[in-house]
Design a protein with these regions (language model features):
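Cell wall/extracellular polymer interaction/catalysis modules
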Residues: 2-162, 173-185, 189
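Conserved "landmark" site that anchors the functional core of diverse proteins
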Residues: 169
């Protein structure tokens, strides 16, 4: 005798799926500060010293306006365990850096630097890059001078402006990472 088919149902909570979108908008009266809204909660963020810019250029301090996708998480494994996320995750190594030279063929890409070699190293002492979400700003195609190393990362305690990134507290970053996947849209502007 066979056993009857018994349907099994699983409750899928919305928190078990990546967010469809995250919205970043400037704060009224202060273009270097903003608000990030996701799944019904809103957190303060720091923006670039140039505010949100529709036509981002290298070195202008602007946070690019547009819709982006997260590519991957980079994190300091020497300081933190791997956070829960739907994103691909990569531990940051001592030699990891980001090319910000528009004349270099590796512009706006991760690179490995030799000890003493200049570049935007991802191993910072100040903890701002303990968690980095790489986004697809100026990624395909990469256009020299249109901006590089635009990330979501940790904020300074006073929420001072960034060079063009969106920064937040560690608690907010960890909460956001739990719901962020490669298909999540990051809408800035």
């Amino acid at each position: 005798m066979g056993s009857p088919d018994i349907p099994i149902t699983y409750r899928i909570d919305a928190r078990d799926r990546p967010l469809s979108s995250i919205r970043v908008r400037p704060a009224a009266g202060n273009p270097q500060r903003g608000w990030l809204t996701a799944d019904g909660w809103t957190i303060p963020v720091a923006l670039g010293r140039g505010g949100i810019k529709a036509n981002k250029r290298e070195g202008d301090g602007g946070t690019p306006r547009g819709t982006f996708r997260p590519r991957q998480l980079w994190w300091r494994a020497d300081r933190h365990s791997r956070p829960r996320t739907f994103l691909p995750a990569r531990p940051i190594r001592r030699e990891d850096a980001w090319c910000e030279d528009p004349n270099d063929r590796h512009y706006n890409q991760p690179v490995r630097l030799a000890p003493g070699q200049a570049g935007d190293r991802l191993t910072r002492e100040d903890h701002l890059y303990d968690f980095i979400v790489e986004i697809d700003h100026n990624a395909a195609p990469r256009i020299a001078g249109r901006g590089s190393a635009v990330f979501l990362h940790l904020a300074r305690s006073n929420f001072s402006p960034t060079a063009g990134c969106v920064s937040m507290t560690e608690a907010a970053m960890l909460r956001l990472l739990r719901r962020m996947g490669r298909e999540t849209r990051i809408v800035i502007g």
